[in-house]
């Protein structure tokens, strides 16, 4: 590999925001926040919304998605158009 053209690939701790589960892996992502890991070293901490610990596919649990707001937004945007076509 050529020197100085690849991003810095280093150990990083990712934390699930919902469950608090943490795992250590390698990434090019960086963060100002750090956390002490089990091996006694400090690693950058990156908090993510969803991991395999909280994703419905991996947990088998269903989550209800808030679609009411999306439906209202759609009706506000396109509802008048549908009413005009219906009145013709």
Swiss-Prot record:
Keywords: Ribonucleoprotein, Ribosomal protein
InterPro entries: Ribosomal_bL28/bL31-like_sf, Ribosomal_bL31, Ribosomal_bL31_B, Ribosomal_bL31_sf
Highest taxon of the lineage: Bacteria
A UniProt-annotated Pfam family: Ribosomal_L31
Gene Ontology CC annotations of this record: ribonucleoprotein complex; ribosome
Record GO terms (molecular function): structural constituent of ribosome
GO biological process, one term: translation
Alphabetical list of PANTHER family matching this protein: 50S RIBOSOMAL PROTEIN L31, CHLOROPLASTIC, LARGE RIBOSOMAL SUBUNIT PROTEIN BL31C
Family: Belongs to the bacterial ribosomal protein bL31 family. Type B subfamily.
HAMAP family: Ribosomal_bL31_2 (MF_00502)
Subunit structure: Part of the 50S ribosomal subunit.
Name of the protein this chain belongs to: Large ribosomal subunit protein bL31B
Organism: Corynebacterium diphtheriae (strain ATCC 700971 / NCTC 13129 / Biotype gravis)
